[in-house]
């Protein structure tokens, strides 16, 4: 199975999302899935990642070699983001069904409230004073929590402020990420599992 992840900023987000999605694929019984990130076209921000014209371009370019398309964006406290993703999923699924005979699918997910929170969910030694519900609700969770944690770990000078290092650690505790992120990770895993089960 070939999985292509579409991100609003692959430069910073790739190192976080790749290990977590790979761990998710193992959890749903697809350990051999080849998971890659779309780098061409390079999307700049959630507006482009949620634009049908951009998504259609990606589906046309990579549809022949991809079974599962997965767009991951920050929620940023925007309650309408899920509705936009739902609309994108419908358009993409219709496009894939009409263009290809083999089963292909497209899912979208918005991280509450930023992708960095998925990483924090799997990390050990998060300051005990931090309340998880507050981390999940914070619109600027990247600056309010993730960057502070990366600084505590002396990772701000590392590539992408330590996102990759921390994500690799977090992915080893994927069960914890799933448990702490029911609105996004748990939901996405359930959708992927159901789709894989239908394939047989």
Segments from the language model and where they lie:
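Short hydrophobic beta-strand that contains or immediately precedes a catalytic carboxylate
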Residues: 5-7
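C-terminal accessory helical subdomains adjacent to catalytic cores in phosphodiester-
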Residues: 1-3, 12-42, 49-200
């Amino acid at each position: 199975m070939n999985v292509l992840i579409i991100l609003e900023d692959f430069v910073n987000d790739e190192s976080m999302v790749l290990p977590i999605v790979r761990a998710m694929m193992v959890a749903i019984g697809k350990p051999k899935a080849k998971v890659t990130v779309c780098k061409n076209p390079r999307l700049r921000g959630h507006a482009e990642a949620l634009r049908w014209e951009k998504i259609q371009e990606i589906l046309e370019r990579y549809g022949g070699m991809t079974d599962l398309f997965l767009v991951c964006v920050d929620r940023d406290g925007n309650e309408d983001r899920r509705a936009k993703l739902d609309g994108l999923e419908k358009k993409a699924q219709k496009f894939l069904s009409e263009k290809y005979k083999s089963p292909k699918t497209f899912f979208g997910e918005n991280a509450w409230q930023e992708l960095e929170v998925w990483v924090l969910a799997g990390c050990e030694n998060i300051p005990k004073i931090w309340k998880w519900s507050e981390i999940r609700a914070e619109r600027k969770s990247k600056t309010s929590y993730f960057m502070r944690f990366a600084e505590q770990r002396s990772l701000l000078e590392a590539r992408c402020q330590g996102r990759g290092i921390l994500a690799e650690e977090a992915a080893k505790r994927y069960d914890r990420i799933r448990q702490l992120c029911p609105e996004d990770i748990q939901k996405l895993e359930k959708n992927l599992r159901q789709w894989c089960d239908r394939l047989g």
